[in-house]
Amino acid sequence: MEVRASRGRIVRLVYVGACLLVLLHCWVSPAVGGACPKPTDEIETDRPDITNSSRVVPQGSLQFENGVNFTTPEKSNVLDGTNTRARLGIAACLEVLVDVPTYFATLSGPAVSGFTNVAPAVKWQISPIPGTIDLSAVAGIGLPTGSQALVGPGPQPYVQFPWSWELTAAWSVNGMLTAFFHPSDPVSKQVYESTLVLERKLSEKAGVFIEWIGDFPSAATARHLLNSGAIYRLSKTEQIDFHIGAGLNGEAPSFVIGLGYSYRFDRLF
């Protein structure tokens, strides 16, 4: 009974948090709406780095981000796809998003195969003024639709804060703080994740990055990963990307490589 009550409290807390994001957005959006992303802006995605963009998609735009990865966790070889995230700008500086279930196929080794959870969320871009530290707040939940052996039991709420700081016209520093809650897991109830990215803009269409990711489970050893990659915009609404990474300790995958393609439809409403 205590586990169910705790699970219900966390789910309700994330639900209330998502509602608060919407209410706060409605309160402050008239003052900052002019600085929010517009359909004339170039596409910005939450990939290929783990760190998500601090900017939302423009109001009335629908963006799909997709990719495939090859990783080597637990002395296994695993291929996963399509890592699809759908993002819809429902108001100025406000979007709803959903992570579509991704399939992990174990090619060799003891790693588990299966689908991940479907995970809806709300994202509010708090500080959209260029030249400052941009910050967004995200509240979401992984619904128990995937393979329990792969992702764990029960609903899995999370809160997240992506941020970015433009140092110069070419250099920027980005990061993200995330708290994942696993109320139905009998061992590890929370996982905290921190990321830090150094990004270099090569041109109006291309950029490269290097990233550190740290995962800190409440009842397990931390995992550290070094990730790097590049993006190239085929147009204002299309992007291809590439990333390659390596684990910094034994708990992280020893190797990861991936490719992605993203596109955006504008002025849908």
Give the residues covered by each predicted segment.
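Cleavable N-terminal export/targeting peptides
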Residues: 1-41, 268-269
